[in-house]
């Protein structure tokens, strides 16, 4: 079957028919959500997956909460109008911390969010020092501090907010090399500590894409913890117990918000993740 880039108004070649499968949307502002999708797909390979990324408003980390909520609701609504959804995963820490209540109020399918894996990190740490690596927005939000107070109040939490690491992860998926010097500069506050964190929470879904490089830069033995596997297990449970019967026999598809040259360059990456086509999604506003 041919695989094509598609504009929103361009007809596509029909996918080879298959058995209808529950339709699951994985959404992020960029491509970081692919790390979460990969965990879900590993556990649940036989679903109909849609990946949507907002390359118009990326990155969300510096946007206002009102903007993020309105934007995420608009995009999920547009996808739902094309494909009835059994479940949606907001695979973006920034969007999850602010948009889940609005999404759950509007839609009758389950909506799963991503939160920093502070609870498991607090259990894993040996020296009691946990690093939280996230966007500046996630580091500053009260929700993050509530998680720390609830699950890690006996740990020393060292937080680093970085928008640059999001850009490095996006560049890696575009085929560019990741600068270890840049990572060392970002992580310098920890690397200079007499006793640095022995467990690091990857509090942005982009950051697992940089796991290999992070392990080269951080002290030997540092544990990296993210939410991907837990999100996959939660998705499996909800699909079995609470999701509506929304299925499709279509091939997996990815949506961008603007068909830019940069988005087109992602097609080979998306194909490796199992998405047949990349199409522009028409979004109001």
From Swiss-Prot:
UniProt record, GO biological process: cell wall organization; peptidoglycan biosynthetic process; regulation of cell shape
EC class name: isomerase
Keyword Kinase: no
This enzyme's EC code(s): 5.1.1.3
Pathway: Cell wall biogenesis; peptidoglycan biosynthesis
InterPro entries documented for this protein: Asp/Glu/hydantoin_racemase, Asp/Glu_race, Asp/Glu_racemase_AS_1, Asp/Glu_racemase_AS_2, Glu_race
Highest rank taxon of the organism: Bacteria
HAMAP family: Glu_racemase
Function: Provides the (R)-glutamate required for cell wall biosynthesis.
The protein's name in its UniProt record: Glutamate racemase
Organism of provenance: Escherichia coli O45:K1 (strain S88 / ExPEC)
UniProt lineage: Bacteria, Pseudomonadati, Pseudomonadota, Gammaproteobacteria, Enterobacterales
């Amino acid at each position: 079957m041919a695989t094509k880039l598609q504009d929103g108004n361009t007809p596509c070649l029909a996918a080879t028919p298959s058995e209808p499968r529950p339709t699951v949307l994985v959404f992020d502002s960029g491509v970081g959500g692919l790390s979460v999708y990969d965990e879900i797909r590993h556990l649940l390979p036989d679903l109909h997956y849609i990946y949507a990324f907002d390359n118009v408003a990326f990155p969300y980390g510096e946007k206002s909460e009102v903007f993020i909520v309105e934007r995420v609701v608009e995009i999920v609504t547009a996808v739902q109008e094309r494909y009835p959804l059994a479940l949606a995963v907001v695979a973006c820490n920034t969007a999850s911390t602010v948009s889940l209540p609005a999404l759950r109020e509007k839609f009758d399918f389950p909506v799963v969010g991503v939160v920093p894996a502070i609870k498991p990190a607090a259990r894993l740490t040996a020296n009691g020092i946990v690093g939280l690596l996230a966007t500046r927005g996630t580091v500053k939000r009260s929700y993050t501090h509530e998680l720390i107070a609830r699950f890690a109040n006996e740990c020393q939490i060292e937080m680093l907010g970085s928008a640059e690491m999001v850009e490095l992860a996006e560049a890696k998926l575009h085929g560019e090399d990741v600068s270890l010097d840049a990572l060392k500069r970002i992580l310098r506050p920890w690397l200079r500590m007499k006793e640095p964190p022995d467990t690091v929470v990857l509090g942005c879904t982009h950051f697992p894409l940089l796991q290999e490089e992070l392990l080269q830069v951080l002290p030997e033995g540092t544990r990296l913890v993210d939410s991907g596997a837990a999100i996959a297990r939660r998705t499996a449970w909800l699909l079995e117990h609470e999701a509506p019967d929304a299925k499709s026999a279509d091939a997996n598809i990815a949506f961008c918000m603007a068909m830019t040259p940069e988005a087109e360059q992602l097609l080979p990456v998306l194909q490796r993740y199992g998405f047949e086509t990349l199409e522009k999604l028409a979004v109001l506003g």
